[in-house]
């Protein structure tokens, strides 16, 4: 169906298209200019036009699509080359000598124009928005032939047919950008006037009136330029294109569309990304980072693995980070890319990194500050046994396990403190970090008194082995100790941050007194790091440090196989168990340890399994660890968690191979590596390790950690601006003054190590193993049906835990306190009492005593996220407004902070202050346009996107990123910012800003829906009784748009 009109625009005769149709209604019609009949035709749709057009005589096919500027449209280019030679009927060929343009140089220029279009597209859309354009997405048509004057004319249309822009202004601006990048001699060939507010553009199969040059598809051209071979007519149409992706608005102020999400590469990730460039950097140098792309400058010609040819001029190399994967791109070929690998924390990063270590393209040794000491203060050698120790005030010894550090220490003690020495009556204190390690040391130094075998003060004993937690039994005296020995010194420092000290203050005070005043100090550790150096320099800086380092690589005959695939690791384990090999399995995950135990028991019921974890009884740990030679000699499989580390050593050659499973959610890399050495001799010297860990963003330097720590306390002294949620210092409390005690400095050093492990767990683990001299390879293997069964067992274990807790005895506060005290003091607690204690803690947390609970209740409400969200909701809804709630929380935490600084600083540093996290979360919410966590208002897409752009362009989210350990988003990408904000709201309150049918509102996450805000207590489930006053709805969205999933119904339950 069609209608015809003489004119397009309105006139007094009523014969124009606009007399009948508004611009809005023309969106759904197809308008054609009929040049032959000098008419405008309006068709109901495109199909009607194609059907009608097919029946028209050839000479009348002079049709042009009418493109209205306000409608979305494809990007298009009209290319015309000047006429060079007349044709006559009897002369079919151009005189090449007189011709300026022939097929070859026309094609060269056309190829140049296509390249520039792709380059500008890359710069405009690929770089900031990760939207790629390939040659196969470019449609090339031609109308080559004789014009009205019988002259040869080259004419082409270039159409980017898979994409559209919002309007003609966007198209015009993009075309201008292309023209700016064309060489001057090419510029005249491109028509700049093809993006007017009303544009006629010739339709495929049509010609101009009086000319036989028909616009057509050209298969030969498509082959030459490697462009699209489509012959679908609708792909050539410009206006309101269907099946296209609408590109972001770049050149106009319209905010209806938003860019696709692409994260910005963080500075902390850049070094890791650059490592993937590897040998490519021989011909390129780093240029800059643009969002998720790393750009390089060419320094010399090189072979391109993507294009399979040499490039010698352009800056073609680009690395793109999508998610955590790193891809290599070439500007000359947008169709292909090479996966280089993945950043830390992703599934195939392990294999990629091991491959780089195997090819020695990675430096695995991490230098420490001790190595920078002058030659007069260090003794470095490479021998299979230890040399004699120096008699110096501060001696630091580094060497791998089983090279004889303790043997040489005994020789040192015999020489300087033996019966024939002048110092035989001098005081010696040997400090250890674990009770079992203390007993192990005593077996080697029988003339020392073990702290646990005597009662009362330890000062009367000249030679004492004492665990860190029992240092309070020593006192400072007028005379310092003569020799202080710190074996496994890094672990000793860790132990001061364990939270297990019953008498922390006196224990740490006596430790620091001995460290600062002892005549001689010896520190020993295979994993010696900068923490020890910094602590010694700070507190024993008046005497020089002497570094004794035996670099002998005892592990050079060991072989490690790494993988990130649990399936590959399990299949190898199963294969070795089927071959009746005896296996050692250390893991830093209690759940994984329990899962492996159940999995192996079901598969191999005849095998004996030794299992040790924090859940093992105190009696079992003490009896077994004191006689591992006997007890471990009875088992086929040995599974243990960090409960076993230094101090427990099995020397017999019983076990064949070690299978380790580690992640970055538990202890640090150094502790994990220590766990590998508890069985000293493996028959095969083979270690098969599965490493897993998500990407984290913890502050890594002492300066950043200190800034973040002080900032959290700083905000407690500031006055909140109710309107802008910003801070000013209170006149009453003033600006805080912090006293940086010895423990404060030790705590900072310990946090640095923990954060490095959380952020770079996989690389640090592999580096430390490779640095021992061990050979590293990638673990491979056949795929068997084990993972589904493994996962099923995991669910069974979790469900049984839920059942045990739900069905446990309901105990009172007195019994719960007794169980807690027994656990703290290492007294064995019955398993049923442990479940009863877990049940009590769960009921106490939600104030849910007196209610019967089910396994499903335990599953839902005993999760970390649900508890964290519940705490956040309770804290933010105590007052009548969020401002009042924030002020109440600030006052509470400030009072605790001031008490802790006066009485027990370690409590302050270990306390999780939450005020600042609330402050940031509410600030983000208000910047989005919502007043509080229970705001029922609805924002349109335009309202929210405008807020995100206007509010966050100048706002630095670094502090918020630090607070929530999240990657900082790109400030120019609203969708990425919203994703970041929703992560914050989800972590703090179990909320998100939800999108539905073009509107945004506050909605519960899955965890948040379990703990609704209510006006008064309900009986059905735990809830948050909120004091927040209702927010008046001010949204312009009609009431009926609130569905059953609206924020009002989800975030506030009336009783």
UniProtKB/Swiss-Prot annotation:
<dbReference type="GO" id="GO:0003688">
    <property type="term" value="F:DNA replication origin binding"/>
</dbReference>
<dbReference type="InterPro" id="IPR027417">
    <property type="entry name" value="P-loop_NTPase"/>
</dbReference>
<comment type="similarity">
    <text>Belongs to the asfivirus F1055L family.</text>
</comment>
<protein>
    <recommendedName>
        <fullName>Putative helicase/primase complex protein</fullName>
    </recommendedName>
</protein>
<dbReference type="Pfam" id="PF02399">
    <property type="entry name" value="Herpes_ori_bp"/>
</dbReference>
<dbReference type="InterPro" id="IPR003450">
    <property type="entry name" value="Replication_origin-bd"/>
</dbReference>
<dbReference type="GO" id="GO:0005524">
    <property type="term" value="F:ATP binding"/>
</dbReference>
<keyword id="KW-0235">DNA replication</keyword>
<dbReference type="Pfam" id="PF03121">
    <property type="entry name" value="Herpes_UL52"/>
</dbReference>
<comment type="function">
    <text>May be involved in DNA replication.</text>
</comment>
<keyword id="KW-0244">Early protein</keyword>
<dbReference type="GO" id="GO:0006260">
    <property type="term" value="P:DNA replication"/>
</dbReference>
């Amino acid at each position: 169906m069609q209608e015809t009109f003489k004119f397009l625009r309105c006139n007094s005769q009523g014969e124009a298209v606009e007399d009948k149709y508004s611009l809005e209604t023309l969106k759904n019609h197809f308008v054609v200019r009929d040049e032959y009949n000098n008419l405008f035709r309006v068709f109901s749709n495109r199909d009607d036009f194609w059907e009608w057009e097919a029946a028209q005589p050839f000479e009348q096919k002079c049709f042009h699509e009418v493109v209205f500027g306000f409608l979305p449209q494809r990007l298009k280019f009209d290319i015309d080359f000047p006429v060079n030679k007349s044709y006559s009927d009897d002369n079919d060929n151009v005189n090449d000598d007189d011709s300026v343009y022939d097929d070859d140089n026309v094609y060269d220029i056309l190829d140049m124009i296509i390249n520039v279009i792709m380059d500008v597209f890359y710069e405009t859309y690929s770089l900031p928005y990760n939207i790629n354009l390939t040659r196969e997405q470019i449609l090339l048509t031609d109308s080559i032939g004789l014009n009205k004057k019988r002259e040869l004319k080259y004419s082409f249309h270039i159409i980017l047919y898979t994409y559209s822009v919002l309007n003609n202004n966007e198209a015009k601006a993009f075309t201008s950008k292309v023209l700016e990048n064309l060489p001057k001699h090419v510029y005249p060939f491109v028509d700049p006037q093809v993006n007017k507010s009303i544009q006629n553009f010739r339709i495929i199969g049509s010609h101009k009136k009086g000319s036989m040059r028909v616009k057509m598809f050209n298969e030969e051209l498509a082959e030459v330029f490697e462009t699209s071979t489509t012959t679908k007519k609708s792909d050539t149409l410009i206006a309101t294109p269907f099946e296209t992706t609408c590109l972001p608005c770049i050149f106009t102020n319209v905010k209806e569309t938003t860019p696709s999400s692409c994260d910005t590469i963080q500075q902390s990730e850049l070094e890791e990304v650059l490592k993937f460039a590897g040998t490519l950097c021989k011909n390129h140098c780093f240029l800059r980072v643009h969002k998720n792309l790393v750009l390089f400058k060419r320094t010399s010609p090189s072979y391109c693995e993507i294009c399979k040819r040499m490039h010698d001029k352009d800056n073609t190399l680009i690395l793109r980070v999508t998610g955590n994967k790193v891809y290599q791109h070439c500007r000359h070929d947008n169709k292909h890319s090479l996966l280089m690998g993945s950043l830390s924390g992703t599934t195939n990063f392990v294999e990629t990194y091991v491959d780089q270590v195997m090819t020695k393209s990675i430096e695995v040794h991490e230098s420490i500050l001790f190595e920078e000491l002058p030659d007069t203060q260090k003794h470095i050698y490479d021998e299979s046994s230890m040399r004699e120790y120096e008699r110096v005030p501060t001696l630091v010894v580094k060497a791998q396990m089983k090279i004889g550090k303790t043997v040489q220490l005994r020789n040192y003690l015999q020489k300087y403190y033996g019966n024939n020495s002048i110092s035989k009556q001098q005081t010696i204190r040997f400090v250890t970090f674990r009770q079992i390690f203390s007993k192990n040391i005593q077996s080697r130094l029988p003339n020392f008194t073990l702290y646990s075998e005597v009662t009362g003060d330890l000062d009367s004993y000249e030679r004492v082995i004492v665990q860190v937690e029992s240092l309070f039994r020593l006192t400072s005296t007028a005379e310092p100790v003569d020799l202080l020995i710190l074996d496994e010194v890094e672990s000793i420092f860790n132990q001061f941050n364990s939270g297990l000290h019953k008498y922390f203050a006196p224990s740490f005070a006596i430790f620091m007194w001995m460290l600062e005043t002892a005549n001689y100090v010896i520190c020993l550790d295979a994993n010696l790091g900068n923490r020890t150096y910094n602590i010694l320099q700070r507190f024993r800086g008046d005497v020089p440090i002497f570094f004794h380092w035996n670099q002998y690589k005892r592990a050079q005959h060991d072989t490690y196989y790494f993988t990130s695939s649990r399936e590959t690791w399990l299949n190898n384990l199963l294969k070795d168990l089927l071959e009746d090999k005896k296996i050692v399995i250390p893991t830093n995950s209690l759940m994984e340890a329990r899962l492996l135990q159940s999995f192996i028991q079901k598969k191999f019921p005849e095998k004996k399994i030794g299992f040790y974890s924090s859940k093992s009884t105190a009696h079992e740990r003490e009896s077994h660890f004191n006689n591992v030679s006997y007890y471990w000699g009875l088992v086929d499989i040995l599974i243990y968690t960090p409960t076993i580390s230094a101090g427990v050593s099995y020397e017999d050659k019983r076990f064949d191979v070690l299978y380790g499973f580690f992640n970055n959610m538990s202890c640090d890399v150094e502790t994990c590596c220590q766990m590998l050495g508890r069985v000293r001799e493996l028959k095969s010297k083979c270690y098969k390790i599965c490493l897993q860990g998500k990407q984290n963003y913890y502050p890594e330097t002492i300066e950043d950690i200190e800034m973040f720590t002080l900032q959290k306390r700083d905000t407690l002294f500031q006055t909140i601006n109710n309107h802008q949620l910003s801070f000013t210092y209170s006149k009453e409390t003033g600006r805080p003054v912090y006293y940086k005690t010895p423990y404060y400095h030790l705590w900072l050093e310990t946090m640095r190590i923990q954060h490095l492990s959380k952020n770079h767990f996989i690389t640090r683990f592999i580096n430390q193993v490779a640095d021992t001299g061990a050979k590293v390879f990638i673990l491979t293997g056949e795929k068997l049906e084990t993972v589904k069964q493994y996962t099923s067992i995991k669910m069974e274990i979790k469900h049984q835990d839920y059942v045990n807790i739900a069905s446990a005895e309901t105990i009172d506060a007195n019994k719960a306190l007794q169980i807690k005290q027994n656990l703290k003091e290492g007294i064995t607690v019955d398993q049923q009492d442990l479940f009863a204690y877990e049940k009590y803690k769960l009921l106490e947390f939600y104030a849910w005593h007196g209610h019967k609970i089910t396994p499903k209740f335990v599953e839902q409400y005993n999760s970390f996220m649900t508890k964290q969200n519940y705490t956040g909701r309770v804290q933010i809804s105590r007052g009548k407004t969020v401002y009042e709630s924030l002020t109440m929380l600030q006052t509470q935490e400030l009072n605790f902070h001031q008490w802790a600084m006066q009485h027990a600083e370690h409590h302050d540093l270990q306390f999780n202050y939450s005020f600042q996290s609330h402050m940031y979360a509410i600030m983000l919410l208000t910047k989005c346009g919502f007043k509080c966590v229970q705001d029922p208002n609805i924002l349109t897409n335009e309202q929210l996107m405008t807020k995100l752009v206007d509010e966050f362009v100048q706002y630095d989210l670094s502090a918020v990123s630090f607070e929530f350990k999240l990657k900082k988003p790109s400030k120019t990408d609203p969708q990425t910012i919203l994703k970041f904000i929703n992560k914050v709201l989800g972590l703090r309150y179990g909320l998100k800003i939800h999108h539905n049918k073009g509107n945004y509102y506050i909605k519960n996450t899955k965890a948040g829906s379990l703990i609704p805000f209510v006006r008064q207590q309900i009986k059905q489930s735990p809830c948050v009784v909120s004091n927040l006053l209702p927010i008046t709805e001010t949204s312009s969205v009609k009431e009926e748009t609130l569905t059953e999933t609206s924020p009002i119904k989800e975030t506030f339950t009336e009783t």
